């Protein structure tokens, strides 16, 4: 996979994220309208208080009585609460719907990239991306798009309102809005991007190290390596803490600068208003209204200033997410090809390598239909790689692999997957029951079908001996089961899938001779209806094959 620190510009990131909002546009518009109306109510609560003071002092006021002023304050306060709640509810509804959509897209990207682009990928880093990085985008969707629109409309409205009294205090107020809501966020975002990226990467590295430490805890305790592991966790935590401290320092600096700018803007508006009052160009009522407006109208604009620090993390997280979504798969999915039925396979002059190492060199072999073909060879000779090429997890570099007369690169991916079942040396299990873990090979399988597959895999008796039988939870990553039991679940899945081409990579490596014999007899029975490609080191396993090949140094003999 590409380096997730591929640096997109903030503008490019914003455009990509905003495009996703299109289906939710009516709700977004409603949130903006309610936000502007809510801030209007909040500001005029203060202004009505000023009118009450003018009325009580016997000065000219738009409101006839103090009671009228307090009545307006009460009504606007209630409206402010309702509008604020509705705005936030709308924004968060949009945010959580879009986060769900992004998670769906990320899961689709992971499926598209698997396995070629994800082999060797740090799982802790992936977990951090799928959880923390996507969750960080909530700030953009719930607290950025709508607040930015609200702030722009609000600043224009308040500037026009003050300009109604006089243009000079309005210009002073507008200058403050621009400094706090535009210049400050841009400045802080540019200066904070590197720190934010470093923090997100440090967080991902820490998650990876902790996850690795938890999974290897048994070995760490056995070999008394706890001190070194603890030191490693401490080092990662200190690095993460230093990056977080740098971020918080910047956030504190932005808050201080924001408050200072608001104070100077208010003083500027007051000073200009008093100067105009002395010149007779602005009444006392205007001085009070302009000053109170400056004091109470910065709420939406301050939200933008605070975004400057927060958005640096959002953009860093979005960059990582977009890097994954944009990653091109090694083997693009075929949807406009052929749905070629399996009628045997042929490997013609195939060469393949990765990481600068040639693994297979011009190998050729024929896999006849409804036969058991065995492949043996030393570890690292390319046996498992050949199986993955037949599954089209990678594409061959030279030569071709054919189903019948059709190159598998022209076979529709869905059709190819439906016709192949691969059992690897490591069986991945989900935190679910044994039955459901087997049933992922065929979701609509009846219980009788599941049990029949388990009998073929020498697993049924073991499952029935458990108190909950097929409803027994396997734990995280199948932690409650032995390696042999997990492997037999993988074999049972393949039998249940009922694909015409069965690829078995060391299917009995973790089994005793008794269970190996049961499975091999089942494989022999299955070859009446299926083609089986069997990879193994064991001579006893190879004895089940109709024809055998040996892979040595990337060549077949």
Give the label of every model feature segment.
Residues 89-108, 149-150, 173-218, 225, ...:
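Cytoplasmic coupling helices
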Residues 1-42, 62-69, 87, 91, ...:
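Membrane-integrated ABC transporters
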Residues 340-557:
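ABC-type nucleotide-binding domain
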Residues 28-83, 164-168, 281-284:
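Transmembrane helix-loop-helix hairpins at lipid-water interfaces of multipass membrane proteins
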């Amino acid at each position: 996979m590409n380096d997730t620190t591929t640096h997109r510009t903030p503008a490019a990131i914003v455009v990509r994220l905003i495009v996703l909002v299109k289906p939710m546009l009516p709700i977004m518009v409603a949130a903006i309208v309610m936000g502007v109306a809510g801030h209007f109510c909040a500001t005029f609560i203060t202004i009505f208080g000023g009118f009450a003071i003018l009325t009580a002092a016997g000065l000219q006021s738009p409101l006839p009585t103090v009671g009228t002023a307090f009545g307006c304050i009460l009504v606007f306060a209630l409206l402010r609460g309702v509008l604020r709640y509705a705005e936030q509810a709308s924004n968060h509804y949009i945010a959580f719907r879009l986060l769900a959509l992004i998670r769906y897209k990320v899961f689709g990207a992971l499926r598209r990239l698997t396995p070629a682009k994800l082999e060797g990928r740090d799982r802790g880093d992936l977990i951090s991306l799928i959880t923390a990085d996507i969750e960080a985008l909530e700030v953009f969707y719930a607290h950025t798009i709508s607040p930015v629109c609200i702030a722009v409309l609000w600043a224009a409205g308040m500037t026009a309102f003050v300009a109604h009294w006089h243009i000079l205090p309005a210009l002073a107020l507008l200058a403050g809005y621009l400094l706090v809501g535009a210049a400050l966020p841009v400045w802080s975002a540019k200066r904070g991007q590197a720190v934010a990226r470093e923090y997100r990467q440090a967080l991902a590295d820490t998650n990876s190290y902790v996850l690795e430490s938890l999974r290897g805890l048994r070995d760490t305790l056995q070999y008394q390596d706890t001190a070194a592991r603890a030191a490693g966790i401490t080092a990662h935590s200190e690095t993460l803490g230093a990056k977080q401290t740098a971020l918080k320092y910047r956030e504190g600096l932005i808050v201080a600068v924001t408050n200072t700018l608001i104070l100077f803007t208010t003083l500027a508006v007051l000073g200009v208003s008093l100067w105009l009052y002395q010149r007779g160009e602005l009444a006392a009522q205007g001085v009070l209204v302009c000053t109170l407006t400056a004091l109470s109208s910065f709420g939406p604009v301050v939200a933008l200033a605070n975004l400057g620090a927060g958005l640096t993390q959002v953009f860093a997280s979005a960059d990582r997410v977009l890097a994954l979504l944009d990653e091109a798969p090694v083997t693009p999915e075929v949807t406009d090809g052929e749905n070629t039925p399996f009628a045997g396979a042929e490997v013609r002059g195939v060469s393949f390598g990765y990481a600068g190492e040639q693994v297979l060199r011009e190998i050729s072999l024929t896999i006849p239909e409804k036969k058991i073909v065995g492949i043996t060879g030393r570890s690292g000779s390319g046996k498992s790689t050949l199986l993955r090429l037949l599954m089209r997890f990678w594409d061959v570099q030279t030569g071709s692999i054919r189903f019948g007369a059709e190159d598998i690169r022209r076979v529709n991916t869905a059709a190819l997957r439906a016709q192949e079942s691969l059992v690897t040396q490591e069986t991945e299990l989900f935190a679910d029951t044994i039955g459901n873990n087997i049933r992922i090979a065929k979701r609509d399988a009846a219980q009788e079908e599941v049990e029949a597959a388990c009998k073929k895999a020498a697993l049924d008796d073991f499952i029935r001996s458990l108190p909950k039988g097929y409803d027994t939870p396997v734990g995280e990553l199948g932690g409650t089961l032995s390696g042999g039991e997990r492997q037999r679940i993988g074999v049972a899945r393949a039998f249940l899938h009922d694909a015409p081409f069965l690829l078995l990579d060391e299917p009995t490596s973790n089994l005793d001779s008794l269970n190996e014999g049961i499975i091999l007899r089942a494989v022999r029975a299955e070859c009446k209806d299926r083609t089986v490609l069997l990879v193994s080191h064991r001579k006893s396993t190879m004895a089940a094959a109709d024809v055998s090949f040996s892979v040595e140094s990337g060549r077949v003999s």
